[in-house]
């Protein structure tokens, strides 16, 4: 039998056509696919890598959550406490247990290195429940009624900020520059200031203020109570009718709930720019309430998690 050999040029054309077709399909899925599909593609093309930065020098001392709560509870009760921990200068991170995966260790170190003069605490599921039971017992029943631990973890982030101040950051995020001077400057004004970051997400504006980064110059900012109450109200309403399906955690205690709480607290945060083009944040215009600062996307979230941009991701790993 005689076989016909396809010319090399034809091979090249077929290869180019295949590459173009696959690229177009992938881009279409990234642009118009559902969020789970986009996330799966993002992870396959740009897997999560540990930071390539090697951190040397001092690291923020670590304290366990139980000790932190004990010290702040003593302060709240008016007892004298001799401690190096400064309210508003605490790095908070959370995981379901104390054994954070090794892939995140260098990212965690980035926060302890960048804020070496602060105090670091890692919260887990047991610590979160203890925090609610000790500091916010009136919400414990609602907390336990939430559908799962991820709802409770999101809820607890608001309480870290209200009870202790400082910065909360997801363990898969990296600190590349300090914000401590800004936080300290706001603390000097007297009223606590809340800090959040905007993201240009492709999903919807509802998801445009993630709770992966949250900061407070001092304990006691009322926004965090508004956000926590938003979740508590949902949990209590659902307790009357368990047939109500639970939406995703972002709607109950995550980013959507946070944005809704900001609107209830001070809608001007989302619409009032401060200064000119060189200023990268927005703030409340109502001087009678504790201020909220919303950083523009390039400060905290320079790229989105549901639509990768190769040139940005490449830059983060160089």
Predicted regions, residues:
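Glycosyltransferase-associated regions of secretory-pathway enzymes
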Residues: 2-153, 169-318
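Small-residue hinge/turn detector
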Residues: 154-166
């Amino acid at each position: 039998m005689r076989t016909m050999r396809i010319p090399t040029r034809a091979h090249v054309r077929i290869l180019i056509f295949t590459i173009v077709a696959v690229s177009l399909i992938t881009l279409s899925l990234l642009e118009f696919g559902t969020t789970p599909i986009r996330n799966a593609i993002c992870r396959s093309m740009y897997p999560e890598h540990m930071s390539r930065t090697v951190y040397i020098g001092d690291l923020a001392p670590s304290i366990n959550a139980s000790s932190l709560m004990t010290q702040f509870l003593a302060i709240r009760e008016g007892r004298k406490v001799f401690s190096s921990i400064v309210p508003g200068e605490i790095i908070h991170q959370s995981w379901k247990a104390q054994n954070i995966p090794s892939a995140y260790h260098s990212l965690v170190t980035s926060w302890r290195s960048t804020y070496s003069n602060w105090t670091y605490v890692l919260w887990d599921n047991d610590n979160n429940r203890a925090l609610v039971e000790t500091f916010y017992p009136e919400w414990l029943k609602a907390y336990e009624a939430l559908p799962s631990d991820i709802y409770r973890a999101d809820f607890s982030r608001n309480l870290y900020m209200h009870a202790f101040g400082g910065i909360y950051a997801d363990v898969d995020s990296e600190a590349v520059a300090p914000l401590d001077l800004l936080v300290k400057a706001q603390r000097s004004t007297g009223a606590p200031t809340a800090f959040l970051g905007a993201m240009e997400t492709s999903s919807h504006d509802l998801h445009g203020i993630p709770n992966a980064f949250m900061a407070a110059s001092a304990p006691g900012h009322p926004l965090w109570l508004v956000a926590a109450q938003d979740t508590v109200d949902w949990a209590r309403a659902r307790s009357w009718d368990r047939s109500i399906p639970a939406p995703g955690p972002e709607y109950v205690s995550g980013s959507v709930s946070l944005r809704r709480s900001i609107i209830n607290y001070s809608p001007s945060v989302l619409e009032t720019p401060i200064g000119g083009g060189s200023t990268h944040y927005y703030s409340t215009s109502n001087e009678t309430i504790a201020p909220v600062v919303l950083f523009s996307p390039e400060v905290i979230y320079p790229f989105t998690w549901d639509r990768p941009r190769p040139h940005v991701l490449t830059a983060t790993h160089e």
